[in-house]
Amino acid sequence: MNSYQIKAVQLDVNGICNSSCWFCPVAYAGNPKSAIRDMPLEEIENIFIQLTNGKGDFVDPDLSLVYSANYNEILLYKEFDSMMDLYAKYNFKTNILTNAVNLTKSKTEILIKHRNSIQGILLNVPSSNPETWSKYVGMNVKLFPKMINNIKYFIEENNKLENPIFIHLMINGINELSLTKNGGWLDLLQNAPKMDLKVQTGDLKKEHDRFKEIFPDLSISTAHHLYDRAAHLETYNIMTQGPAIEKYLKPNGSRVVGCNGGLGVRSRTNEWIHINPNGDLFICCADFDFETIYGNAFKTSLKEVWHSRARVDMVNESYTKMCTDCSAAIWGN
């Protein structure tokens, strides 16, 4: 019997992204074809009903946020407007993670309409230079001005609201502080993009300054602590966190005993559920290929799956395999 309650939910409803960011496995392997599917609205509602009815039992009574991002672009979901109706119906909120290419005027109208069901919007735009952006995300350079105009239009419309949606632009990148030798958590490999890593004058700092010129009133930050979730990017010689794990984590013990990788709710193994477009429950978003599936929300109730022996066994198996390559793992004896 699992004594924990579900405190966080990640629900991927389409399994597809139109971007190929250099720091994401999608750029090298593509989205797993087994889970590229628009989840029907009735299946989404089924999950929301189970979560709602389970509050106070196997679900935390305060659960209100259902994340809609995995390795997908949520704005590509064909029934996005109707999906947001379901979020409102069951009093759930979500954060929108988008590359902004799909942040069209029509999508902006939908987001504004569903303002009360949206906690915030996070823009993943790694470069302010059209050619560099195209290289970093694997999209046609001609889409760059469209993407910039999409953001400007959203800001304009959002500012008309009495209580605007919080929107933040995150510049994912690398600088010297990212590296293990400097106290960081990664090391670049031979296939990584060539970048100036200087903290004060390098590429990441320049990107931040240029974005502030383009969007002077927008919340903007750089994110130099990138993650190679379970060593996927190491496979393609992009980056590795192996030396950092050896340096910072393994001295604490001989094996993985827990997880510290969740947003807000820390333990993805004990307090999160991750659901792919097929309704499969898997251990963590680090499991890019869905190798840790332990149940299905439509074949067995969420409560049964949450309390199942299969789930316990998969957590324990993950601690000996997938989690050993993760920088969020907790090591002990």
Residue ranges and their predicted role:
Residues 14, 18, 256, 320-323:
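Residues immediately within or flanking Cys/His clusters that coordinate Zn2+
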Residues 1-10, 57-59, 246-260, 329-333:
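N-terminal [4Fe-4S]-dependent radical SAM core
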Residues 1-121, 132-145, 149, 158:
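Conserved alpha-helical substructure of the radical SAM core
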Residues 261-269:
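Short, small/polar residue-rich loop motifs at catalytic or cofactor-binding pockets
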Residues 1-7, 27, 267, 274, ...:
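Flexible mid-to-C-terminal extensions adjoining Fe-S/redox cofactors in radical SAM and related proteins
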Residues 23, 261, 325:
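Short, cysteine/histidine-rich loop/knuckle motifs that typically chelate Zn2+
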Residues 8, 12, 55-68, 88-95, ...:
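Conserved C-terminal portion of the radical SAM core fold
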Residues 20, 30-33, 74-76, 104-105, ...:
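Short catalytic/ligand-binding loop motif for oxyanion handling, primarily in non-cytosolic enzymes
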